[in-house]
């Protein structure tokens, strides 16, 4: 469950959200997966590395335009990438969850593609709400 304070941070500051996620436990479907140890912020239309750079809106990145607290999952080079959408609806910014520290020190979560494979995350999570 997310606190009201964290939800407010998500809606106002993507970089602060990326920092605040560090050390948090990532749970999917009620199952704890590990502690978030690496994130990367994508700052929307002004960020040339972001899928919504220059206000580019496509069916593939549509989940980025949902309200803060939704997942944006996309595939690149055969790997799924897990992003947490930030900002209010129609303002496309997100934080990529890059790595987890698992309870057993599992090394298969030490990169964004390895993390999603370890967690069993696929495109079906795209657009889902926390």
Annotated model-derived regions:
Residues 1-130:
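Conserved, well-structured core segments that form or line functional sites
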């Amino acid at each position: 469950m997310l606190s009201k304070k964290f939800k407010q941070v998500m809606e106002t500051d993507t970089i602060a959200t990326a920092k605040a996620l560090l050390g948090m436990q990532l749970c999917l479907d009620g199952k704890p997966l590990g502690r978030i140890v690496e994130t990367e912020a994508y700052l929307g239309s002004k960020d040339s590395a972001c899928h919504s750079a220059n206000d580019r809106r496509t069916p593939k990145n549509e989940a980025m335009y949902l309200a803060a607290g939704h997942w944006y999952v996309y595939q690149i080079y055969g790997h799924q990438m897990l992003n947490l959408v930030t900002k209010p609806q129609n303002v496309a910014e997100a934080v990529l969850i890059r790595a987890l520290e698992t309870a057993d020190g599992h090394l298969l979560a030490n990169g964004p593609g390895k993390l999603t494979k370890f967690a069993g995350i696929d495109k079906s999570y795209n657009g889902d709400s926390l």
